[in-house]
């Protein structure tokens, strides 16, 4: 059974800050509190439109984090150049559309193998570990292994958005099967998107899961309970799921 880690996404601290054009709340301070509460890493998505996290945030976080930085980004020349210069510990390559509210699905790695292979190599040559954000699909998982990514992050949005218990159980089984298949190919398996305090335990209980990246639910809970308690409670639920 893989060690289970929690990556806390702090994008929406920046969303709150940018809503008023102020210097607060500060994502760097939020990252420090999350680390104190047990976060194993900090995830930020530097979007092309800079709607929340900024280049300055990325630079300061890379210099100040005690744990690991996971930079989510689109596969563009601009973002690859920023990553190579900043050298986060991890980069998670994601699809990105300007009009979307949040990432809506996984990368089509199988349909753009050469582009993904080049991106993975460029990042790896800079000493950055790469994960590909993909759906729980065997063809995409095979393609991820073929292009040289050591990690995948399984998109859990369909599981999180399931309208019935039966639909959620079906999505859970699909994710579990995908995690087993990916592990058989030598990939390490992360997961994220839409995970909350109500649905995280079933995903955390999947033996092959290495890390869960969770943001919106934690920041939403933090508004009510405080960020430290929110992170600590999420970590407790994850570890409890492992017995």
Curated annotation (Swiss-Prot):
<keyword id="KW-0963">Cytoplasm</keyword>
<dbReference type="GO" id="GO:0033856">
    <property type="term" value="F:pyridoxine 5'-phosphate synthase activity"/>
</dbReference>
<dbReference type="GO" id="GO:0008615">
    <property type="term" value="P:pyridoxine biosynthetic process"/>
</dbReference>
<feature type="binding site">
    <location>
        <position position="194"/>
    </location>
    <ligand>
        <name>3-amino-2-oxopropyl phosphate</name>
    </ligand>
</feature>
<feature type="binding site">
    <location>
        <position position="9"/>
    </location>
    <ligand>
        <name>3-amino-2-oxopropyl phosphate</name>
    </ligand>
</feature>
<feature type="binding site">
    <location>
        <position position="20"/>
    </location>
    <ligand>
        <name>3-amino-2-oxopropyl phosphate</name>
    </ligand>
</feature>
<comment type="function">
    <text>Catalyzes the complicated ring closure reaction between the two acyclic compounds 1-deoxy-D-xylulose-5-phosphate (DXP) and 3-amino-2-oxopropyl phosphate (1-amino-acetone-3-phosphate or AAP) to form pyridoxine 5'-phosphate (PNP) and inorganic phosphate.</text>
</comment>
<comment type="pathway">
    <text>Cofactor biosynthesis; pyridoxine 5'-phosphate biosynthesis; pyridoxine 5'-phosphate from D-erythrose 4-phosphate: step 5/5.</text>
</comment>
<feature type="site" description="Transition state stabilizer">
    <location>
        <position position="153"/>
    </location>
</feature>
<feature type="binding site">
    <location>
        <begin position="215"/>
        <end position="216"/>
    </location>
    <ligand>
        <name>3-amino-2-oxopropyl phosphate</name>
    </ligand>
</feature>
<protein>
    <recommendedName>
        <fullName>Pyridoxine 5'-phosphate synthase</fullName>
        <ecNumber>2.6.99.2</ecNumber>
    </recommendedName>
</protein>
<comment type="similarity">
    <text>Belongs to the PNP synthase family.</text>
</comment>
<feature type="active site" description="Proton acceptor">
    <location>
        <position position="72"/>
    </location>
</feature>
<keyword id="KW-0664">Pyridoxine biosynthesis</keyword>
<dbReference type="InterPro" id="IPR004569">
    <property type="entry name" value="PyrdxlP_synth_PdxJ"/>
</dbReference>
<feature type="binding site">
    <location>
        <position position="47"/>
    </location>
    <ligand>
        <name>1-deoxy-D-xylulose 5-phosphate</name>
    </ligand>
</feature>
<feature type="binding site">
    <location>
        <position position="52"/>
    </location>
    <ligand>
        <name>1-deoxy-D-xylulose 5-phosphate</name>
    </ligand>
</feature>
<feature type="active site" description="Proton donor">
    <location>
        <position position="193"/>
    </location>
</feature>
<dbReference type="InterPro" id="IPR036130">
    <property type="entry name" value="Pyridoxine-5'_phos_synth"/>
</dbReference>
<dbReference type="GO" id="GO:0005829">
    <property type="term" value="C:cytosol"/>
</dbReference>
<keyword id="KW-0808">Transferase</keyword>
<feature type="binding site">
    <location>
        <position position="102"/>
    </location>
    <ligand>
        <name>1-deoxy-D-xylulose 5-phosphate</name>
    </ligand>
</feature>
<dbReference type="InterPro" id="IPR013785">
    <property type="entry name" value="Aldolase_TIM"/>
</dbReference>
<feature type="active site" description="Proton acceptor">
    <location>
        <position position="45"/>
    </location>
</feature>
<comment type="subunit">
    <text>Homooctamer; tetramer of dimers.</text>
</comment>
<feature type="binding site">
    <location>
        <begin position="11"/>
        <end position="12"/>
    </location>
    <ligand>
        <name>1-deoxy-D-xylulose 5-phosphate</name>
    </ligand>
</feature>
<dbReference type="Pfam" id="PF03740">
    <property type="entry name" value="PdxJ"/>
</dbReference>
